[in-house]
Amino acid sequence: MDHFRRQMRAKAYASDAEVLHQLAALAPSPEARAEISRQASAMVARLRAEAKPSVMELFLAEYGLSSEEGVALMCLAEALLRVPDAATMDALIEDKIAPSEWGKHLGESHSTLVNASTWALLVTGQVLDAPETGMAGLLRGAIKRLGEPIIRQAVARVMREMGQQFVLGQTIQKALSRAAGFEAKGYLYSYDMLGEAAVTDEDARGYHMAYADAIAQIAKSASGKDISSNPGISIKLSALHPNYDLQHRAEVMDVLVPRARSLALLAKSAGIGLNIDAEEAARLDLSLDVIEAVLSEPSLARWDGFGVVVQAYGKRAAYVIDWLYALAEKLDRRIMVRLVKGAYWDTEIKLAQVDGLPGFPVLATKPHADMHYICCAQKLLAMADRIYPQFATHNAHTIAAVLHSARAQKVTNFEFQRLHGMGEALHEQVLQEHGVACRIYAPVGHHSDLLAYLVRRLLENGANSSFVNQIFDAEVPAHVVAADPFEKAQEAGPKISLPADIFAPGRRNSKGFDLSDPEVLAHLQAQRVRRQTWSYGDLGHAHPVHSPATSDQIGQIRFLSADQARQLAAAATPWQITPAERAAVLRKAADLYESHAEAFFALLTHEA
């Protein structure tokens, strides 16, 4: 198992090409890919001919991220999370809604609700964009001022309504009641209590209690003899501890592990599954430590209801799957693995660039992520003796690829999953025609918790290349919607600058350190504790420097005399008229700082 963890760390920032090359043996053959594409195209054609799309699918088709109006709505939804007061909210709404051309969308959707929303946005934009001159302008200005509170409430209501398309209920009781209709059709559920990472320990205790209460309520619906036929729950580890990062590992293992373990024991007693949700890449290594510690609890022996979510866009996904299989063998049990595409792509790309990391922890293009998903799915199906595969996708091509691989490997014990409010018609087709179990991932929470979840879903599915965005768009042919990602990957798309190159050609970005990698931290720590004395300066009298913490001498420094300082200042005068040489020296100094960063860190910790 340690072998897989070492590989995982070594390949965290490998190139997309290297990651996919290592999984080439798992990729479908050209003949299989052709058959998969045919089946996927047939699925899409049948959906368009027979199915009724959901409101959210119609909304995304009309207002995807390919339109200025769609971008405005995404920005508005995301920014409303951080608006501190009514005045700022009014300014934000005016900035995002007034300039957009809502009229061109009027009457374009098949949904009355979507068209009504468009009409409301059009009227709002006209009020906010009123000219401010003349008597008419004064009158319209008054209407604008009087209308701002109403508009503010209306926009918040629209955002809330959008969020409710994705949320099953505000309480677990309401969600369970609403789920009964789909359960009667043969669907299963996995409930997710909405909420972002805990900020305080009080938050964490509150989330823990909410999870425990939800498990108790879900248990009442768990009538099946097998865990895979019962509802389940998903939990976020970041909700159970306010400092869920590697720098607080000891505290996390002491506090978070018992909390997660207690929830697992409750789920075991209830006869339901419990999945650990995937989060940002920086938390992956620590999450595996927590997962192993929880699953190693003797009282959880012979329980096959523990699950882990793996994000296929992550470059380490295949190694995580190998590690989970090894853990299942070690503990002699079966682990559920939910394979998802991934929900934090934009964040991961931006953080890697800002932090100057060696590369990206995620695959840089959607076709590469789709290819990786298919290869990881093949791996999971081959491990079905210890893994219960759960394939979360709304993409017809991905579903066709999984079905093809399952038939080839003669694996029947797996399930598909979809988000509540998304992919309903596609999964209904899979359930009815292929007899494969389908589980609905159902968020549960209050209005105050909706927007962050909504933004992630819209960013995932709102892009013009998204399957969900295109599936009911008649202008996009079925074979294009269900295109083979292995072929699409050959097309040259926009290149995302690597972290080191974001300021090119002017200069290279400064180098950062992945402080979520235990091996990076161990290297920095080794430099810090290594006995070393530093000496700086070539002129003047030497003065010893001591650590303020231990009084040990850590080196010496030489100070210039007044005469020496005057001589250097005089010599520096011509320096002002040689910008090229000065720039070269500064670049050289920056390179030296970077190449000796570990020594500087060590010195700083001794002198602090």
What are these regions (language model features)?
Residues 1-508:
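Positively charged, amphipathic and often flexible ligand-engagement surfaces
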Residues 469, 473-606:
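Short, structured beta/alpha segment
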